[in-house]
Structure formats: C-alpha cells, structure tokens
C-alpha cells in the first residue's frame, strides 16, 4: 500500500510503500538507519541485515544523501521518534542516486546556505518553518472566512504609493510610470466600501537598503479593511486574529515546534486581550528605563520596541503616535490633532512590529488637506479621495507582515528563514 509519512499512523503493523528522499543515514554493523523525508514529514527506516536480502542491506549502507527511492516496510510504533513511528524496511528501490550533495550534515555558513537555498529548504529545520508558515496562512483564511470577510486581490502594479514614500521599485507601464505595490491598502478601502469586510494576502515590495534581521525586500502581507469599524474595534479584530493563528500553530504544528526547539510555554500565553499603551506612555517608560536617545516625536527603533515588549512578555499595542510619524490617511484623535488613531502591535522576544493599523480618514476635505501637507499629487489619489464623496463611513484596517510573524512564532533568528526564496539587499539568487 502506497502512503505518505504523515499518514503512517493509519497503518501500524501493515506493510507500506513510501516515495522518499534520504535525509541522512548511519549504520552500526548489522543495522542501517535511514532518515527519510517525503515532504509531509520525516521517519526513520531501520534495515536489519538478517531480515532482508543482502543486496537491499548493501543498498541501505551505500545509499547517498538526497537519493530518491521507493522504500517498503512495516510501520511500527516507536516512542523515541518525534513522529511516534518507524519503518522496519523490507525493500528498497532506488529512483535516482544523488552525488556530491553540497549541504552535508555539518555546519555551514549563512552565505553558503543562502547560495544553496533551493537545497537548504530540504533540511528538517527549514521544512518545519515552512510548515508553520503554511499553517499561519491556512489559519488566516479560516479566521477571516469565519468572521465574514471577503478575499479581495488588489493590483501589484500601481500608479502611486500608498505610504507616500520614495522606497519604490519603478517600472515602465507602456508610456506611464508604474510601481511594484508597497501595500494594497488603498484598494482594499475601496473594496470595503463595496463588500463591508475584506482582506487581501499577497506580496509587497520595498526598496529599503536595510540589512536587519527584520527586513526583506519582498514580503507577504495580510491586509484587512472594515467599513463601519472604528479604532478600538479594529484592535479587537487584530488581537483575536493573532491569538487564533498562534493557537492554531500550537495545535497543528507540534512536531515542527519540537523540531525547532521552540519554547511553547510563551506561545501558550498569547491570548486576547493584549496590553495597550499610548505613544506618550511608551516614551515615558523608555526614559525611566534609561533610554536617553529618544524624544517625543521620534520613531522607535528595535531596542526601544524590544524593551517595551519585554516588560509585557506578550504582544503589546502602542497607540496614538504623533501625526508627523505616520502616513497621510490616518484619522486624527478627536481630543488631540497632533496624534492619530493608530497602533503598532509589537511581538515579544525581540521580534518587533508585526502589525501596523489605524482608523482611516473618512472626511474628504481632511484627506485632501493631508495629501497637500505630505506633498502628494492629488490627481494620483483622486479615485481614493472620491471614496469619501459617496456615502463615506468610519472605517479601519491593518497590515500584518507574514514573515515577521512566522519568525516570532517559530523562533527563527532572521526573517530570511521564513520565506522560501528571500529577497534581501544584495541577494536576488537563487
């Protein structure tokens, strides 16, 4: 019976056939141990010389790393295995013998591994991170579908920048200039006026010359927008969503978290509601902690975010930032025009901001005024401003960076491990 590694639990005591690759091997005299992977998981195949034909045992001893094969054996329970099962091998059929596989079971430098990213993905650690990434994506769709959101796909080629920044990848669009999207937010606001509650999931591109462990040039974002939703309700959606995906990973990725050595006790504490502090309170807190490099009106750096997050040891919202620090589309607070109704969600354990969100401006005159203040071409944003002309309502939204979220939940030290083929400063290969 042909099966996959993640389904062997259904076949205890039965003989099965699995198509797999040899991840590693070792032998001790009359027994050979093959670490096998098939994309769904890892299992150990045990080949006992006295129980198989001599040719099969010799194949098991000589088979090379990453050789592909069909392997037949009897599924047995094994408490020592992370999977809980092993395969008592009865037959091996080599499909293709791999030679000189470059990523041997020794330590390799980061640049070497990045040059061989197409092969590094096969490792047990990278496999675990990709499975966690997949579970976060799956749980994202489940959460927003359950909450009545409609999936909308904004364009990747745009004629303007949502953030109003210069960190854009430009290209020619026939006789016009176009840019790779930094965010689908403006289009999602239009969709929310048609469909009520919407979300998008797609790639974004930022030409930031940054080499930190938190930054990628190309990354994926989840961007919900909601009509008739004001600031506080927006925060509630965010904390419920983050709590949901964390609990989903804890439930469905136990083997992967164990493979990564992730301390799940910290993740188990991630449940809504999350603490909230204002920007003013954050500045005061940092000064009390001895940070003398920040004043009101300054943005937070990684050390500042880490200090704040460590104090709470769970995700924390920093709210009501100065207007001068944020994009043009954010709604000002009713009691203070110098701050806006926005929040950044800071992940614990030093992973920094994973969500940025706000209530959006819904008054057309105010929006047009903000566009002028930011020096933006009003003609390029005419369609966006027009959303406030025909039945405008309070509305809010946010964007969650997938790779930073994967890094936090999986415990990865750098976001380059959280996307299959990372695009970094000075790295476009493979």
Swiss-Prot record:
A Pfam short name: tRNA_anti-codon
Enzyme class: ligase
Keyword ATP-binding: yes
A single BP term in Gene Ontology: asparaginyl-tRNA aminoacylation
Keywords linked to the UniProt accession: Aminoacyl-tRNA synthetase, ATP-binding, Cytoplasm, Ligase, Nucleotide-binding, Protein biosynthesis
EC numbers on record: 6.1.1.22
Keyword Nucleotide-binding (UniProt): yes
Cell compartments where the protein resides: Cytoplasm
Reactions catalysed according to its record: tRNA(Asn) + L-asparagine + ATP = L-asparaginyl-tRNA(Asn) + AMP + diphosphate + H(+)
Chief location bin: cytoplasm
PANTHER family: ASPARAGINE--TRNA LIGASE, MITOCHONDRIAL-RELATED, ASPARTYL/LYSYL-TRNA SYNTHETASE
Family designation: Belongs to the class-II aminoacyl-tRNA synthetase family.
Subunit text: Homodimer.
Protein's name according to its UniProt entry: Asparagine--tRNA ligase
Organism: Bacillus subtilis (strain 168)
Encoding gene (name): asnS
């Amino acid at each position: 019976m042909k099966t996959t590694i993640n389904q062997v639990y259904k076949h205890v005591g039965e003989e099965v056939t699995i198509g797999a690759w040899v991840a590693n091997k070792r032998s001790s005299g009359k027994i050979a141990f093959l670490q096998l992977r098939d994309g769904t998981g890892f299992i150990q195949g045990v080949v006992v010389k006295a129980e198989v034909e001599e040719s099969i045992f010799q194949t098991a001893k000589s088979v090379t790393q990453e050789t592909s094969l069909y392997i037949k054996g009897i599924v047995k329970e094994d408490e020592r295995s992370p999977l809980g099962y092993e395969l008592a091998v009865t037959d091996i059929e080599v499909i293709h013998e791999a030679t000189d596989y470059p990523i041997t079971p020794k330590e390799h430098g980061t640049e070497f591994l990045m040059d061989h990213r197409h092969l590094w993905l096969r490792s047990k650690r990278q496999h675990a991170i990709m499975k966690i990434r997949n579970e976060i994506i799956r749980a994202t769709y489940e959460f927003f579908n359950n909450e009545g959101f409609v999936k909308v796909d904004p364009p990747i080629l745009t004629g303007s920048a949502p953030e109003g920044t210069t960190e854009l990848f430009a290209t020619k669009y026939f006789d016009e200039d176009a840019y790779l999207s930094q965010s689908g937010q403006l289009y999602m606001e239009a969709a929310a006026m048609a469909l009520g509650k919407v979300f998008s999931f797609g790639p974004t591109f930022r030409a930031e010359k940054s080499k930190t462990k938190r930054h990628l040039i190309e990354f994926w974002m989840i961007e919900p927008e909601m009509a008739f939703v004001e600031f506080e309700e927006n925060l509630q959606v965010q904390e419920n969503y983050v709590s949901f995906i964390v609990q989903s990973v804890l439930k469905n990725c136990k083997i992967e978290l164990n493979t990564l050595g992730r301390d799940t006790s910290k993740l188990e504490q991630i449940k809504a509601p999350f603490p909230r502090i204002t920007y003013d309170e954050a500045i005061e807190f940092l000064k009390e902690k001895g940070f003398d490099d920040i004043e009101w009106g300054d943005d937070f750096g990684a050390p500042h975010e880490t200090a704040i997050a460590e104090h709470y040891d769970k995700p924390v919202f920093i709210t009501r930032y100065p207007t001068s620090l944020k994009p043009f589309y954010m709604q000002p607070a009713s009691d203070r025009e110098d701050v806006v109704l926005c929040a950044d969600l800071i992940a614990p354990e030093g992973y920094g901001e994973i969500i940025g969100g706000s209530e959006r401006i819904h008054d057309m005159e105010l929006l047009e005024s903000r566009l002028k203040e930011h020096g933006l071409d009003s003609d390029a944003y005419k369609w966006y401003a027009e959303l406030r002309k025909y039945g405008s309502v309070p509305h809010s939204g946010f964007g969650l960076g997938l790779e930073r979220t994967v890094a936090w939940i999986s415990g990865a030290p750098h976001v380059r491990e959280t996307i299959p083929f990372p695009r970094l400063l000075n790295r476009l290969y493979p």
